[in-house]
Regions:
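Short, highly charged, low-complexity non-transmembrane loops/tails of multi-pass membrane proteins
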Residues: 239-260
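Membrane-interface helix-boundary motifs at transmembrane edges
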Residues: 4-6, 53-65, 120-126
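Cytoplasmic-side transmembrane-helix entry/capping segments in multi-pass membrane proteins
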Residues: 40-42, 61-72, 95-98
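N-terminal membrane topogenic signal
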Residues: 1-17
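Membrane-interface helix caps and helix-loop-helix hairpins in membrane proteins
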Residues: 30-35, 57-58, 83-93
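Alpha-helical transmembrane segments of multi-pass membrane proteins
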Residues: 48-52, 73-78, 135, 139-146, ...
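Membrane-interfacial alpha-helical segments at the cytosolic side of multi-pass membrane proteins
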Residues: 100-117, 155-161, 220-234
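Interfacial helix-loop-helix junctions of multi-pass membrane proteins
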Residues: 83-94, 140-225
Length: 262
């Protein structure tokens, strides 16, 4: 209990510090006249409230450790990544966030299926492996839907969410001079765009490599959490690491106690 109380205090302090930094960022963007970034800052403050909203509406207790990871993830994606251009300044920033996203979405999927698993309205009780598999599938589905969103924004609104990738060589059937269905290897040193030569050391892939990389690291994050979830359920909720990361479904008694406290 003391350890959990300490985590809650740390979570609260981190949220206050991050919120203060976001407010300062919003004010700065306002004075700079960058209203798009100002909107992103306001959106960040709203997203900070999502864990508490889910806690109340779904009768799920989000551990302080997991909530802290969520808050840092939101701050890293919107304030550092978008407003401060960490996606450009730090090449692996996007990879880190997509891996974390796979982990977090698996946690949410785990909590959702656990709601059904513990509900008195359902007679079927699912095994730890099925719960973990559902969490994994939920995370991957969210990852795929996000890539659909990135593609749509690029295609219809001229954005660049699916980042470009320099590919130094290709293997292509199309470039085989004999016309045979045999790929040939071609090293690419430069490319020509509208008559202008760009010596980039390769050709410019406009999304497929970035998309596949994002899905692969999302897969890794989802697998890691699913393994943690299996161990947690097989050991009947024991383990400090798992307990600090896995949302807990509140019992009726805990829910009534929580309602009285509010």
């Amino acid at each position: 209990m003391k350890a959990n109380s300490g985590l809650k205090k740390s979570r609260t302090k981190i949220q206050m510090v991050l919120s203060a930094l976001v407010i300062l960022s919003v004010a700065r963007q306002f004075f700079l006249g960058n209203y798009h970034n100002m909107f992103l800052g306001i959106l960040t403050l709203i997203l900070f409230m999502v864990p508490q909203f889910l806690d109340r509406k779904l009768s799920v207790t989000i551990p302080p450790g997991l909530e802290t990871v969520i808050l840092i993830f939101i701050f890293s994606a919107e304030i550092l990544g978008e407003i401060n251009a960490f996606y450009v300044k730090i090449p692996i920033w996007d990879t880190i966030l997509h891996t974390t996203n796979g982990f977090l979405m698996a946690a949410i999927g785990f909590a959702l299926i656990d709601l059904f698993n513990r509900s008195d309205r359902f007679s079927i009780k699912m095994s730890p492996y099925f719960v973990a598999f559902f969490a994994f599938c939920f995370s991957m589905t969210v990852g795929v839907m996000w890539e659909f969103f990135e593609f749509s924004m690029d295609w219809f609104f001229g954005m660049d969410m699916q980042k470009d990738w320099i590919v130094p060589a290709i293997n292509s059937v199309k470039l085989n001079p004999t016309g045979a269905n045999v790929p040939i290897h071609v090293d690419v040193q430069s490319l020509v765009v509208n008559g202008e030569t760009w010596n980039l050391g390769g050709y410019l892939d406009i999304g497929i490599v970035d998309t596949m990389k994002d899905l692969i690291v999302n897969f890794i994050g989802a697998v890691v959490f699913s393994i943690i979830g299996i161990l947690y359920l097989r050991n009947r909720g024991k383990g400090k690491l798992a307990a600090s990361l896995i949302p807990q479904v509140r019992s009726k008694q805990e829910e009534e106690h929580s309602s009285r406290d509010q």
